[in-house]
């Protein structure tokens, strides 16, 4: 038994999740009436639901508190590129939704249609009210918009705090991330339960829906990596960006694909920046910062899953509302890619814009974890490779002007 446990712990999380998916599907076909197996999925989603608001608060506040006033102009350019690139990716995901609308198989609760907001005006009003919610109430009631806003406020306020105070905030973020890592390590069992529950209730045909979801997610991220990012790079540099784009994807993206963590890929990116001959004073700051706030892949994941949930519930979304969704997903993604699967835990933030309950939003998160073996790897590859790309683009743009 000890040998089995040791071998299990040595196996990568990706392989363990894949094993959970296979076993869950087999059990769902063979013994669909043993519903207690689905309890594993309910407990896993419950754990995520419990820690998600605190995770958003801690990571966002910590990330913003670490930014320094008076950064050199090149650093400001990189930050603008990070944020604009993330927003462009979010908008690309919205457009892909209109071209390839997809729906999900959710639980029985989805049979009751969510109250659809009456256009952008109602969405904006609801957004404003959620922003000024009591911060403690926002955490306890999983009001992610309120959590996000207060985290941003506290994060900026903490920029002028003492280093000791910032260290406490950083420690809180680390502790919260560690708890999330413990929960994520239980993902194979939770996903086994989720897949079992899905297959036993909906049959094998539901797997085709997941296949379409994976194609839309990966296709959108590929479009961002090979079309959107090169366009941004060309505008900044004024020359062919593809040699640099492919170098970043090859040397950074491939490694990030397997680590599934932008934070874990920081040493690889720092070495790549050195190989590219970039300014160490710049990339020593921009790469760690990018692993926290440069979230193109996360923005794609959040928007695709949110809009899939919206389609499933029959909610009509105009483009103005979808544009607000892109802004919200860009901001809320701050801090997500430092941990494996972090972007999925931010889907409820975006879902709350459309009046989707936290229970339904967490079902969507569960679907995200089922496809996460591929989604999270591709997302991290896009996020991490873009850190180096935009750092290099900003510096080469300065060289062009000098």
UniProtKB/Swiss-Prot annotation:
The reaction(s) annotated as catalysed by this protein in its Swiss-Prot or TrEMBL entry are: L-serine(in) + Na(+)(in) = L-serine(out) + Na(+)(out); L-threonine(in) + Na(+)(in) = L-threonine(out) + Na(+)(out)
> Membrane-spanning residues where?
17-37, 44-64, 78-98, 138-158, 179-199, 212-232, 295-315, 336-356
Source domain of life = Bacteria
| Molecular function GO labels | neutral L-amino acid:sodium symporter activity
Which keywords does UniProt give here?
Amino-acid transport, Cell membrane, Membrane, Symport, Transmembrane, Transmembrane helix, Transport
List the GO terms this entry assigns under cellular component, sorted alphabetically: plasma membrane
Main subcellular location of this protein, as a coarse class = membrane
Q: Which GO terms describe its biological process?
A: serine transport; threonine transport
Q: How does it sit in the membrane?
A: Multi-pass membrane protein
- Cell compartments where the protein resides: Cell membrane
Q: Which family does it belong to?
A: Belongs to the dicarboxylate/amino acid:cation symporter (DAACS) (TC 2.A.23) family.
HAMAP family, per the entry: Ser_Thr_transp_SstT (MF_01582)
Function of the protein: Involved in the import of serine and threonine into the cell, with the concomitant import of sodium (symport system).
- Its protein name is Serine/threonine transporter SstT
């Amino acid at each position: 038994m000890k040998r089995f446990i040791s071998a299990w712990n040595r196996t990568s999380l990706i392989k363990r999740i894949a094993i959970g998916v296979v076993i869950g599907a087999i059990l769902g076909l063979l013994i669909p009436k043993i519903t207690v197996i689905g309890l594993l999925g309910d407990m896993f989603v419950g754990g995520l639901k419990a820690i998600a608001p605190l995770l958003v608060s801690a990571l966002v506040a910590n990330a913003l508190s670490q930014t320094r006033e008076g950064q050199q102009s090149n650093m400001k350019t990189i930050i603008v590129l990070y944020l604009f690139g993330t927003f462009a990716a979010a908008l690309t995901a919205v457009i892909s939704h209109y071209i390839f609308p997809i729906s999900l198989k959710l639980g029985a609760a989805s049979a009751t249609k969510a109250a659809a907001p009456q256009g952008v005006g109602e969405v904006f009003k609801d957004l404003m009210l959620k922003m000024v919610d009591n911060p403690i109430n926002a955490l306890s009631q999983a009001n992610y918009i309120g959590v996000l806003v207060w985290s941003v406020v506290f994060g900026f306020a903490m920029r002028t705090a003492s280093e000791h105070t910032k260290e406490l905030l950083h420690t809180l973020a680390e502790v919260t991330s560690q708890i999330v890592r413990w929960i994520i390590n239980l993902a194979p069992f939770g996903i086994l339960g989720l897949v079992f529950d899905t297959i036993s209730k909906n049959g094998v045909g539901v797997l085709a829906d997941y296949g379409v979801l994976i194609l839309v997610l990966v296709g959108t991220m590929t479009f961002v990596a090979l079309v959107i990012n090169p366009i941004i790079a060309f505008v900044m540099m004024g020359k062919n960006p593809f040699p640099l784009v492919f170098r970043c994807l090859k040397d950074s993206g491939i490694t990030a694909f397997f680590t599934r963590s932008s934070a874990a890929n920081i040493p690889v990116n720092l070495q790549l920046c050195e190989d590219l001959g970039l300014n160490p004073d710049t990339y020593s700051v921009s790469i760690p910062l990018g692993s926290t706030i440069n979230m193109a892949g996360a923005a794609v994941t959040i928007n695709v899953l949110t809009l899939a949930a919206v389609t499933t519930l029959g909610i009509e979304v105009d483009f103005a509302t979808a544009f607000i969704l892109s802004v919200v997903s860009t901001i809320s993604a701050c801090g997500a890619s430092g941990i494996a699967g972090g972007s999925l835990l931010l889907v409820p933030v975006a879902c709350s814009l459309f009046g989707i309950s936290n229970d339904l939003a967490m079902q969507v998160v569960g679907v995200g974890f089922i496809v996460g073996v591929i989604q999270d790897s591709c997302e991290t590859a896009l996020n991490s490779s873009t850190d180096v790309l935009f750092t290099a683009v900003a510096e080469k743009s300065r060289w062009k002007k000098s």
